[in-house]
Structure formats: C-alpha cells, structure tokens
Amino acid sequence: MSNHSEILERPETPYDITYRVGVAENKNSKFRRTMEDVHTYVKNFASRLDWGYFAVFDGHAGIQASKWCGKHLHTIIEQNILADETRDVRDVLNDSFLAIDEEINTKLVGNSGCTAAVCVLRWELPDSVSDDSMDLAQHQRKLYTANVGDSRIVLFRNGNSIRLTYDHKASDTLEMQRVEQAGGLIMKSRVNGMLAVTRSLGDKFFDSLVVGSPFTTSVEITSEDKFLILACDGLWDVIDDQDACELIKDITEPNEAAKVLVRYALENGTTDNVTVMVVFL
C-alpha cells in the first residue's frame, strides 16, 4: 500500500469476484514536488458479495482533503446505503458528497480541496422481480457514479468510450453561469482567478462558489462492457477518452493497463500528478 492509497478488503468468500482492479500512480517529480492524488477501492463493498467501490481523488492546496476522502467517503456511502437500501444510489452519492464536503470544511485546517470520481458497482434485482427472489440469473449488475471537478470515469462498451462524468471547469459555460449567479467571477478560466474547477470537496474559502454537489449517473453493466478507467486530469489533459480506451483494450491485466496509461501521460507532457485505476468488468 502506498502512502496515498486506501485499499480495503472485506472477508474472503468461496465465490469469485467478477471484476479485477489495477492501479498505477506517479508523482511526476519533473513538475511536482508533492503527490496530492489518493485512490481507494473496496472489495465486497458494504459487506455485500461482489460489490465494489472505486475512487480517485485529486488534491489541491495540500493533500488533506484528498486524504480525508480516501479514508472516509466510502464509509459514509456505505452507512447511507445500509440505512435505506431502497433509496436510489445516486441520491445516496449526492448526500454523501455533501456530507464529506461539510466534514472537510469544519474539521480540517486550511483551504485544501480535491476533485473526486467515485463508482459503486453492485448486484440488483430489476423492478419487475420480487425483492425476495433467490434466482441469481435474475440479478443484474448496476454501476453508479458521482464526480466533482475534472477527475473522470470512462466506460469502454462494445468498442466505444462512454464518459460517465462531467468536467466541472471554469471554462464550461453552464458552470461559469452558476458561479457568476452565486456572486463569483471567472477570470482566465478560473474561479475568482484562482481555481480551475468549479466543483470540489473542501475549498471552504470559496464558500458557495465552488460546491460539492456531484454529477451522478447509473448504468446497467452487460457483457458488452469491458472495463472502466478512473483517472485524474493528469491523464485526461493529454489524451481523450476513446484513445485511452484504444491504448489498453488488448491488455489482459488491469495493473498493466493502468501502468500503460500513466506511462503515456508522462511521456506526452502532463505536468500534474497522475493516478489511473482500471477496473476489468
């Protein structure tokens, strides 16, 4: 385990996990003195067989916020899911992001913040099937995602990349309008001339301008879905979604796939920390 990761496993079961996870990271010491990225994954998430939690956090103004999210966000999400298992997980993710945003702003000193890209993968019964059905063939895998900022999640489906997140940047027209309506200014594609992202966890000195409310999605995972890429902008600054997927589509090991993407980012001029998580589905 690196100093900047939280890799957690629930008790092993006699059943196989249907997904495989690989992670690679690099401080990029040519341009960065510190590593502010954090990643987390949890097998058998919420003590449920074959559920998964996957997340990357890209810190700024210090590592405090990203480290706090790496240690605590999955616990908040788990508690909220188990408190009411009938709730839409997208609502759970939204509430959990807002809760940890408040925690960071009240419990941590300074103005540290982070972007976040989070996935919850779980088995569900379709609405048309009784909740007490024991027929495993009737269960389906559902993926729920949430993000703030410009960390991104991409699904590779049937040869095509599908972006499951939204880049909350000050250069985005909708986000620019929201910030200005809240009383902020966009200068040189930055909030008040300082911060490039318009949504994050933490950043308490920006108050209502930079918010923790995430973009959320849900999608059924089928046999057409090959893998997920979760990565900070250190990767996406130098490669687009489809090219990233094409680069690793023939690789059979997720750790190797993640390493290939990190290596590509470093060789193609990224100036940021780089963290990549690849989940084979």
Curated annotation (Swiss-Prot):
It is an enzyme of class 3 (hydrolase). The keyword Magnesium applies. Mn(2+) 2 binds at residues 58, 233, 272. Binds 2 magnesium or manganese ions per subunit. Manganese is about 20 times more efficient than magnesium. Also has activity with calcium. Its EC number is 3.1.3.16. One of its GO terms (biological process) is signal transduction. It holds the Pfam family PP2C. Its cofactor is Mg(2+); Mn(2+). One of its GO terms (molecular function) is MAP kinase serine/threonine phosphatase activity. Its main location: other. Residues 20-281 form the PPM-type phosphatase domain. It catalyses: O-phospho-L-seryl-[protein] + H2O = L-seryl-[protein] + phosphate; O-phospho-L-threonyl-[protein] + H2O = L-threonyl-[protein] + phosphate. Keywords: Hydrolase, Magnesium, Manganese, Metal-binding, Peroxisome, Protein phosphatase, Stress response. Present with 1520 molecules/cell in log phase SD medium. Belongs to the PP2C family. Interacts with NBP2 and PBS2. Serine and threonine phosphatase. Involved in tRNA splicing and cell separation. This is Protein phosphatase 2C homolog 1. It comes from Saccharomyces cerevisiae (strain ATCC 204508 / S288c). The gene is PTC1.
